[in-house]
């Protein structure tokens, strides 16, 4: 293998995206993994996307990432979530075949000519004069590189807990990275401990699906990737059941057998993915909690018991699972477990995800205190692009909070740090009406093309689609709809009032009871129009006022973002700042006045003082 320019440690969702991005930009990359058979592994839930997370997948795809394509290639169920809410918060979710997803990602990795995979434990970093210049393998072999990206997931000093039993592991059946974790602490990177976990898996043949509610997903599967024309695959249903009174009694009577409550686990758990013990202890008034039985794939009967994540003893887990209706005879294939691991506080990172203390060292994924496949993949892509740009002498690749959910996430991480596992949600984005799933390509595809990660033909197809949308919107604005029986029948049948004067097609569509499908019925939009195109037109027209308002807010936001703060700006000379606020600003080292405004604790008066000092 040729010597690498970039080394990536870890071949999970972050590592794969980082490696693929850098290799596709023409740099020689080595991707380290403990086991080549676990490249792109889904170690927890067999799904991609969700509220907020689906937005990330679409953005990753628009920038040339691989996650959306791998999900499309392994999809066994599709759902649009949040359909009762507005378009800004709706998200796509795919149930995936766990094995096929991993194989699709491995195939993508192995097809890249500039990318080499190495099955080996990385025991340490080579750091010389404040710069990371390579890695040291467990064998003692040293490999030099211009940049190193750590995408180590839960492997840094990982410890698995099942009841009173605990043992070192990065994942079930895999060794942890103890030496690397110690070195990061010795290098002065601010480290902490988080806790996550995974539910039990059961043998599908032992589950009584007839006793559960079937969830068959949506009839039409919409691809995540612009590069997927259509998805024609076998589909599988999920099934819903609920915990019982017996389930709750078992947990309450055995709470101290959980390391989460006995004091053995010190790591902070994820707020939005609580264990069963947490749900029952924190919400005693709840009579039941949902349990979703999800298929693991087409080639196995194994099912994932979403909602039953716990760290109770293995023998107690059998009784616990069998207390749930439909699981009375269930055979556990893999018990649930909790895992503690080291993370690095991301406030020590630059916006590029390079560490401030050590040049050439980038961190991506769960090592930065995040939770979730999609969050990890987005960071991996971001770090891979920026490491490549640094080596090639190009400007950093930065998206801001008004560009993308990726920009929101990275800004949150590096500006505010984390005190619990960070999970993306639509509520984190101030400009979410502008950052919808359906316009991810409008926002980011040209950037992906400029990076060399999106082919010309993909851009051409999207440009044609955008021109068609603009032409149809212009046609609606030009057409006049006059009161008549056909029009008023549509309006009244939807619960609206008759129109009494001529309206443009645009004003007619703005009425809450009118949809794009009604315009097709009336001949105002072409019959057979693509449903996604019709939906995009409807959103643009109905939400025009709100969208314009958010665009004005973005203009004000960008005015502050344009005011850059030098790397060596002296916050000690700013009058009126408290000592605590000075320390926070010096720790974060905001790159702009806009970023400074989001540092926890900063007030409008403090921001004005910084601005005045900057002008001096």
Q: Residue locations for each model-derived region?
A:
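Glycine-/small-residue-rich beta->alpha transition segments that form the dinucleotide
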Residues: 147, 152-156, 312, 325
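Core beta-strand elements of the Rossmann-like FAD/NAD(P) dinucleotide-binding domain
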Residues: 138-147
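Internal hydrophobic alpha-helix adjacent to the cofactor/substrate pocket in enzyme cavities
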Residues: 376-397
């Amino acid at each position: 293998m040729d010597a690498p320019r970039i080394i990536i440690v870890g071949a999970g969702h972050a590592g794969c995206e980082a490696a693929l991005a850098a290799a596709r930009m023409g740099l020689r990359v080595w991707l380290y993994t403990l086991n080549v058979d676990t490249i792109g592994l889904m170690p927890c839930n067999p799904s991609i996307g969700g509220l907020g997370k689906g937005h990330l997948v679409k953005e990753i795809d628009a920038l040339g990432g691989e996650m959306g394509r791998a999900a499309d290639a392994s999809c066994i169920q599709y759902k649009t979530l949040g359909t009762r809410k507005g378009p800004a918060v709706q998200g796509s979710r795919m149930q995936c075949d766990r094995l096929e997803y991993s194989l699709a990602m491995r195939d993508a990795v192995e097809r890249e000519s500039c990318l080499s995979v190495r099955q080996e434990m990385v025991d340490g970093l080579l750091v010389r004069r404040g710069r990371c210049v390579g890695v040291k393998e467990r064998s003692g072999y040293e490999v030099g590189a211009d940049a190193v990206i750590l995408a180590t997931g839960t492997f840094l000093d990982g410890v698995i807990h099942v009841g009173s039993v605990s043992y070192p592991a990065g994942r079930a059946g895999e060794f942890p990275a103890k030496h690397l974790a110690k070195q990061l602490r010795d290098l002065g990177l601010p480290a902490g401990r988080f806790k996550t976990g995974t539910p039990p898996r059961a043998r599908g043949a032992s589950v009584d699906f007839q006793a559960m509610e079937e969830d068959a997903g949506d009839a039409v599967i919409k691809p995540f990737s612009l590069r997927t024309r259509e998805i024609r695959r076998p589909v599988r249903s999920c099934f819903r059941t609920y915990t019982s009174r017996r389930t709750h009694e078992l947990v309450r009577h055995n709470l101290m057998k959980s390391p989460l409550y006995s004091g053995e686990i010190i790591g902070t758990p994820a707020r939005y993915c609580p264990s069963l013990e947490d749900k029952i202890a924190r919400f005693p008034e709840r009579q039941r909690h949902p349990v979703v039985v999800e298929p693991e794939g087409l080639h196995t009967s194994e099912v994932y018991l979403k909602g039953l994540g716990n760290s109770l003893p293995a023998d107690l887990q059998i009784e616990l699972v069998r207390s749930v209706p439909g699981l009375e005879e269930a055979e556990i294939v893999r018990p649930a477990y909790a895992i503690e691991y080291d993370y690095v506080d991301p406030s020590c990172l630059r916006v590029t995800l390079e560490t401030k203390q050590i040049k050439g060292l980038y961190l991506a994924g769960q090592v930065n205190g995040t939770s979730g496949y999609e969050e990890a993949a987005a960071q991996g892509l971001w770090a891979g692009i920026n490491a490549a740009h640094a080596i090639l002498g190009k400007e950093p690749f930065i998206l801001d909070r008004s560009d993308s959910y990726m920009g929101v996430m990275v800004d949150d991480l590096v500006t505010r740090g984390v005190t619990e596992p960070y999970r993306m949600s639509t509520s984190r984005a101030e400009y979410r009406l502008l950052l919808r799933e359906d316009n991810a390509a409008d926002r980011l595809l040209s950037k992906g093309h400029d990076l060399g990660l999106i082919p010309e033909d993909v851009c051409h197809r999207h440009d044609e689609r955008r021109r068609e949308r603009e032409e149809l919107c212009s046609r609606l604005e030009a057409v006049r709809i006059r009161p008549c029986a056909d029009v008023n029948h549509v309006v009244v049948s939807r619960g609206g009032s008759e129109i009494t004067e001529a309206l443009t097609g645009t004003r007619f569509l703005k009425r809450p009871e009118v949809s794009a499908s009604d315009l097709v019925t009336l001949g105002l939009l072409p019959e057979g129009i693509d449903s996604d195109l019709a939906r995009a037109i409807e959103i643009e027209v109905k939400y025009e006022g709100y969208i314009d308002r958010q665009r004005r807010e973005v203009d004000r936001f960008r005015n502050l973002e344009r005011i850059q703060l030098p790397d060596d700006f002296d916050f000690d000379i700013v009058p009126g700042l408290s000592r605590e606020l000075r320390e926070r600003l010096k720790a974060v080292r905001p790159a702009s006045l806009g970023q400074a405004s989001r540092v926890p604790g900063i007030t409008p008066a403090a921001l004005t003082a910084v601005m005045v000092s900057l002008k001096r």
